[in-house]
Regions:
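Acidic, small-polar-rich N-terminal luminal/periplasmic segments of exported/outer-membrane proteins
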Residues: 24-140
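Short sequence motifs at beta-strands and strand-loop junctions characteristic
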Residues: 113, 122-124, 150-153, 190-195, ...
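Outer-membrane beta-barrel pore domains and translocons
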Residues: 116, 133, 146-150, 176-178, ...
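Transmembrane beta-strands of outer-membrane beta-barrel proteins
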Residues: 141-145, 171-173, 211-215, 302-306, ...
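Transmembrane beta-barrel wall of Gram-negative outer-membrane proteins
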Residues: 142, 149-180, 184-255, 280, ...
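Outer-membrane beta-barrel proteins
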Residues: 156, 180-186, 222-228, 302, ...
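Acidic/polar loop-and-plug regions of large Gram-negative outer-membrane beta-barrel proteins
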Residues: 205, 212-289, 314-352, 408-430
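Face-selective signature of the C-terminal outer-membrane beta-barrel domain
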Residues: 283-312, 342-456
């Protein structure tokens, strides 16, 4: 039995925007200590190949400590692509966010970084990409436990248990729990990021270790209102620095309005509805994956990976702002109690994104080392279905911690009388609302020849 606590960290002055760096390949000591056994199962070729590469670093995004850093290189790619067992962790992060379904947690055996050229050949995406591999298990029992906390009250629990069943079966089970209240209190919820992800898997060893086939299940459930809460007013000094606005401390004060709901016009139904701030950031998905490989006697290595993922809720909220100005009572802005307001205000914009996502992905490759040439032929068949719409509205708020929403005279275009009435929201769906329902299919064949000209 080998139970090992992998990581324990207590941050005394941590912010949610702190970036971390992972040095790769990961778990190097553990992998070296178990190389003999891996060879007997023929499961080691991926880690061996990665050890031969120069080390590459994967840095987490400075704006989000739960996903890789987005690196813009001036070529068409929507964001950083993350692959899990040779397939996209999420097909597109524009609706179903990567951090809602994938974390660099204890369920992973290791990670690697693909260059734009490698990613372009294998996937068609021209971008730096993170390639991750699941922990499948080994003959002996192993446990990995990571725990992180900070003085704001964040706690993160990350556990993996794996081992063997009999001679030819392996198992793995993982649990990821994140309780992050953020660096300031959100009055409408307890956590800026409440994410839970579970993994379960069984692996069958084939033909005395020449191959394996694994069935993996994943469930993710994430609520991340911190995605729209990370905003703050400031004064731009003109030299690249900012100055604080009196009474507001960026990063420590909340710029999310104090009341818990808004009226908006639903793009899909055409009706006025109420958005409660506790809703709108929910994501949950179920995924089942089949990953396999087999080493033939003639030297050819065949890999076949496939998965189906269904996310019936893939929602998020965007906030935007504009310039800050000062108004007087004569400008007609009122607080919720009907009193006239004078002082600083900012025009705010809000987008509500509601989506349902599903995809079926398959990738197969066959490769062989021929002298100083490594040949590989691959096939991708990726299907993606999206049912998505967004609604937008505008509002004006005070410039202070927990802003108050201000009402003003507004003519609702849906009002047949076209009478001006006092309203806290306006400009319904004037800011790029969208409705999309459809599917996309990608079929690709690729061939590579990695020619090592000299032994060095």
């Amino acid at each position: 039995m080998n139970l090992k606590i992998r990581t324990f960290s207590m941050a005394l002055a941590a912010m949610s925007a702190t970036s971390y760096m992972y040095a790769l390949p990961s778990n190097n000591i553990e992998e070296k200590s178990s190389t003999k056994e891996k060879k007997s199962l023929n499961l080691e070729e991926e880690s061996v190949e990665k050890n031969k590469k120069e080390e590459r670093n994967v840095m987490l995004n400075a704006a989000d400590a739960n996903k890789p850093r987005e690196i813009q290189i001036g070529l068409p790619s929507e964001d950083v692509t993350v692959y899990e067992n040779g397939l996209p962790a999420v097909y597109s992060s524009s609706v179903h966010k990567l951090s809602a379904h994938w974390r660099g947690d204890a369920s992973l055996k290791g990670t690697d970084l693909m260059t734009p050229s490698e990613s372009a050949i294998a996937t068609g995406n021209i971008a730096y990409a993170v390639s991750s591999f699941s922990e499948l298990g080994q003959k002996e029992f192993k446990g990995k436990l990571n725990y992180k906390a900070n003085h704001f009250g964040m706690q993160n629990f990350d556990l993996n248990l794996s081992g063997g069943i009999g001679t030819n079966w392996l198992y793995t089970a993982s649990m990821y729990q994140n309780f992050d209240p953020g660096s300031f209190k959100l009055r409408f919820t307890d956590y800026a990021d409440r994410t839970q992800i579970y993994h379960f898997g069984l692996t069958r060893i084939l033909n005395e270790g020449k191959g394996r086939i694994s069935l993996l299940y994943k469930y993710s459930n994430s609520k991340n209102p911190g995605n729209f809460a990370n905003a703050a007013p400031f004064i731009y000094a003109g030299d690249g620095s900012i100055k604080k606005i009196a009474g507001f401390d960026p990063g420590m004060n909340s710029y999310v309005q104090r009341q818990g709901s808004f009226q908006y016009l639903n793009t899909k139904t055409g009706k006025m509805e109420t958005w409660n701030m506790t809703d709108g950031s929910e994501n949950h998905a179920n995924e089942i994956a089949l990953i396999s490989q087999y080493q033939f006697d003639n030297g050819w290595l065949w890999k076949f990976n496939a998965k189906y993922m269904n996310a019936p809720r893939a929602n998020y909220v965007d906030y935007g702002g504009s310039s800050i100005s000062e108004v007087s009572e004569a400008d007609g802005y009122q607080l919720s109690d009907g009193s006239a307001y004078s002082g600083l205000i900012e025009g705010r914009r809000t987008w509500l994104h509601i989506g349902k996502v599903s995809n079926a992905l398959m990738t197969t490759e066959i490769s062989k080392q021929l002298n100083n040439h490594k040949l590989m032929i691959g096939l991708n068949e990726w299907y993606y279905h999206l049912d998505y719409y967004s609604s937008s509205f505008q509002w004006a708020g005070t410039v202070e911690p927990y802003p108050r929403t201000l009402s003003q005279m507004y003519v609702n275009p849906l009002d047949p009388t076209q009478t001006a009435r006092r309203s806290e929201t306006f400009g319904y769906n004037e800011l790029s609302p969208e409705y999309t329902k459809g599917s996309e299919n990608k079929l690709a064949v690729y061939f590579t020849d990695e020619w090592k000209v000299t032994p060095k």
